[in-house]
């Protein structure tokens, strides 16, 4: 699964939603310049050293970020209080970008959790 498959996946979304998802993709790529972009579990995912770091996708009523760790959301509980969540996802509006500052915090928390034994 390659970067081209991620691009193809995103082309399936309506233009306005696709713009938001492409922006998120670019921000994640800037934060994780060595990551590979793949499709994992049917969603675009950034992988570092063979480990999924963060995924994202769009849906009919929301977009989602998948930190591949339910613990990330609990670590950032207060920062994520305004976002609907499931055990493995953080939902955000279809028409509004996900805050880059919060994206950085999610990535930082993910890497810190990965360092724990």
Please place each PLM-identified region on the residue numbering.
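Charge-dense, helix-prone N-terminal extensions
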Residues: 1-117
